[in-house]
Amino acid sequence: MSNIEERVKKIIVEQLGVDEAEVKNEASFVDDLGADSLDTVELVMALEEEFDTEIPDEEAEKITTVQAAIDYVNSAQ
């Protein structure tokens, strides 16, 4: 597991209050991890802060799974 992947998953666990074992790459924030729209906004904000980047709204809307978050952060680095 890459450092970025570990950091993204740690943020997801902290933000959504889910068990680390539930945070699989293919997991959907809403369908699998029980996030609502406010949770996803807070998650994007936490990712922006952790990785010192700005995620435009149109990109943030596409980040719906753990893997999508990892991929976005990797591409933004």
UniProtKB/Swiss-Prot annotation:
<protein>
    <recommendedName>
        <fullName>Acyl carrier protein</fullName>
    </recommendedName>
</protein>
<comment type="function">
    <text>Carrier of the growing fatty acid chain in fatty acid biosynthesis.</text>
</comment>
<feature type="domain" description="Carrier">
    <location>
        <begin position="2"/>
        <end position="77"/>
    </location>
</feature>
<dbReference type="GO" id="GO:0000035">
    <property type="term" value="F:acyl binding"/>
</dbReference>
<comment type="similarity">
    <text>Belongs to the acyl carrier protein (ACP) family.</text>
</comment>
<keyword id="KW-0444">Lipid biosynthesis</keyword>
<dbReference type="GO" id="GO:0009245">
    <property type="term" value="P:lipid A biosynthetic process"/>
</dbReference>
<feature type="modified residue" description="O-(pantetheine 4'-phosphoryl)serine">
    <location>
        <position position="37"/>
    </location>
</feature>
<keyword id="KW-0443">Lipid metabolism</keyword>
<keyword id="KW-0275">Fatty acid biosynthesis</keyword>
<dbReference type="Pfam" id="PF00550">
    <property type="entry name" value="PP-binding"/>
</dbReference>
<keyword id="KW-0597">Phosphoprotein</keyword>
<dbReference type="InterPro" id="IPR006162">
    <property type="entry name" value="Ppantetheine_attach_site"/>
</dbReference>
<dbReference type="InterPro" id="IPR036736">
    <property type="entry name" value="ACP-like_sf"/>
</dbReference>
<comment type="pathway">
    <text>Lipid metabolism; fatty acid biosynthesis.</text>
</comment>
<keyword id="KW-0276">Fatty acid metabolism</keyword>
<keyword id="KW-0596">Phosphopantetheine</keyword>
<dbReference type="InterPro" id="IPR003231">
    <property type="entry name" value="ACP"/>
</dbReference>
<dbReference type="InterPro" id="IPR009081">
    <property type="entry name" value="PP-bd_ACP"/>
</dbReference>
<keyword id="KW-0963">Cytoplasm</keyword>
<dbReference type="GO" id="GO:0000036">
    <property type="term" value="F:acyl carrier activity"/>
</dbReference>
<dbReference type="GO" id="GO:0005829">
    <property type="term" value="C:cytosol"/>
</dbReference>
<dbReference type="GO" id="GO:0016020">
    <property type="term" value="C:membrane"/>
</dbReference>
